[in-house]
Amino acid sequence: MKTDDFDYKLPEELIASYPLENRDASRLLKLNKQTGEIADYKFTDFIDFINPGDLLVFNNSKVMLARLYGSKTTGAKLEYLIERIKNPKLFETHIKANRSPAIGSEIYVEDTLAKVLDKDGGMYLLEIQGDKDIYQLMEEFGHIPLPPYMKRDDEEFDAERYQTVYAQDLGSVAALTAGLHFSKELMQQIKDKGVDIAYITLHVGSGTFKPVQVDDVESHKMHAEVISVPVEVCQKIRQTKENGGRVITIGTTSVRSLETAGQNGQIEPYQGETDIFLYPGKKFNVVDAMITNFHLPKSTLIMLVSAFADKEKIIKAYEHAIAERYRFFSYGDAMFIF
């Protein structure tokens, strides 16, 4: 299976650089994964596609203000993308610099001195030497880390709009994009309809933007991300399945979390890292349907939806979306695959 099989041509003007005024004003492409039937809807129509007895699983991870700036003691400028916080004074980060900082050197993160303890590939381990911790630095100076394809700096509204309304657990460096469409009003409508809701956590790493760089899909090594699938979520899933309801995931992060926890065919609580890679030929043990945005060509995420719905059906759906001028990627429109 070749990575090029998952390529498609996207007109640049269809990349959504800005969100719509209202979260739930986006469009929704409905794809039947059995028949390949495609239909166009508004996102607010999603309420009509779910039933009492179904379970919606959301990822409650919160995007960090993970982009920070600083300098070497020489004054040379540095740019940071915080990847993972080990404790308030110790964290892993990417550093953009003309010349990489040496292990053992001291550098500034904004106005605070930090020591470079280690480097592994492009990832640095830093320990803050000053009084402030990384949470304080992000709160005071941090920027929302918009993806490179938006080709713009973050603006004030991004702090709210690049975040879901139910975000709770700080730790992601990218938005849970399928969840961005859910307004507080729509969440209330879902509850009022008698549809159950559950929350898992997967902290999205910067590897989500990493293109697949090998020719053979099976050779790709996924980045690891931290997930939590609690006991009560597993109980809800088992109950839903027993009662004939559907488990509907909001976003590929929720898919990867549940399929990690259900790898042995039975959903079990899971706390730790996952590097699960779902591509055509892989089996889904838990997920019955999903809401997901439109994904980058040749990405692991377009491979995931192709595994769920069949590659030819996905490519046809994407071609339809392009012809109908859907908006793509993080701030773009969504699909409901069932």
From Swiss-Prot:
Its main location: cytoplasm. Keywords: Cytoplasm, Queuosine biosynthesis, S-adenosyl-L-methionine, Transferase. InterPro entries: QueA (IPR003699), QueA_dom1 (IPR042118), QueA_dom2 (IPR042119), QueA_sf (IPR036100). GO terms for biological process: queuosine biosynthetic process; tRNA wobble guanine modification. The keyword Cytoplasm applies. It catalyses: 7-aminomethyl-7-carbaguanosine(34) in tRNA + S-adenosyl-L-methionine = epoxyqueuosine(34) in tRNA + adenine + L-methionine + 2 H(+). GO terms for molecular function: S-adenosylmethionine:tRNA ribosyltransferase-isomerase activity. Pfam families: Queuosine_synth. GO terms for cellular component: cytoplasm. The keyword S-adenosyl-L-methionine applies. Coiled coil: none annotated. Monomer. Belongs to the QueA family. NCBIfam families: PRK00147.1, queA. This is S-adenosylmethionine:tRNA ribosyltransferase-isomerase. It comes from Francisella tularensis subsp. holarctica (strain LVS). The gene is queA.
